[in-house]
């Protein structure tokens, strides 16, 4: 993989199967799974901002799931942040995901813990041990997402936009080279969505590639970037 290339897909076909990382051979999964996308070639480099657009069911989310190994890559060549997706084992998946950031539309925050603990617990779970380093990194990401004065707040005390900023902060804790965002502005009003896009652009400018699925063409017009259209399984 080139030094600054974080995604490389060549001749990739993506299937949805009931047990994508089970014990069945790829040939059986291909035969019994549902073909979602075919003949995908894609390269993304550090610091690049890329939109994935298309109708619901066009395969945007399936591509993202393949990149963070929720779906197994069965056909074609694929590398993400140095990991070969065709050779990936179940035990490798946590290590892959520590090198990428993932932002979901539905937040998935720990509702019984405040902003600080939502981040602190993730860092402990991913191997951080030194207390001073943990607190320093939490301060850094909270400043980046403009939540430095909200660390004591509970998730229910935050607005929708602030909750999404917390999710982004969580995704950035391990300094990823790639951020994957699945419809991150889908539940937000236009002004708040603009703020999230500005934040993503700032993150990309710092060298982290951002790949974002969306159906909001107004955002793309206001914040133009490389755009990939998904239609008819491609």
Describe the residue ranges of each PLM region.
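ABC ATPase NBD coupling module
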Residues: 85-101, 205
């Amino acid at each position: 993989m080139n030094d600054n290339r974080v995604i490389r897909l060549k001749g990739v076909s993506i299937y949805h199967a009931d047990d994508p990382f089970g014990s069945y051979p790829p040939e059986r999964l291909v035969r019994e799974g549902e073909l979602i996308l075919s003949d995908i070639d894609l390269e993304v480099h550090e610091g690049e901002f890329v939109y994935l657009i298309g109708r619901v069911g066009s395969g945007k989310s399936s591509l993202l799931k393949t990149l963070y190994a929720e779906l197994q890559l069965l056909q074609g060549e694929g590398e993400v942040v140095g990991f070969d997706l065709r050779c990936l084992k179940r035990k490798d998946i946590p290590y892959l995901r520590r090198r990428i950031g993932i932002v979901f539309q539905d937040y998935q925050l720990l509702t019984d813990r405040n902003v600080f603990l939502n981040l602190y617990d993730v860092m402990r779970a991913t191997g951080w041990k030194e207390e001073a380093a943990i607190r320093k990194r939490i301060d850094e990401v909270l400043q980046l997402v403009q939540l430095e004065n909200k660390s004591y707040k509970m998730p229910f005390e935050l607005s929708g936009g602030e909750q999404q900023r917390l999710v982004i902060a969580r995704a950035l804790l391990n300094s990823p080279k790639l951020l994957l965002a699945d419809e991150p502005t889908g539940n937000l009003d236009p002004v708040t969505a603009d703020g999230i896009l500005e934040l993503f652009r700032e993150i990309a400018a710092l060298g982290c590639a951002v790949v974002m699925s969306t159906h909001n063409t107004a955002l793309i017009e206001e914040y133009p970037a490389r755009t990939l259209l998904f239609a008819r399984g491609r």
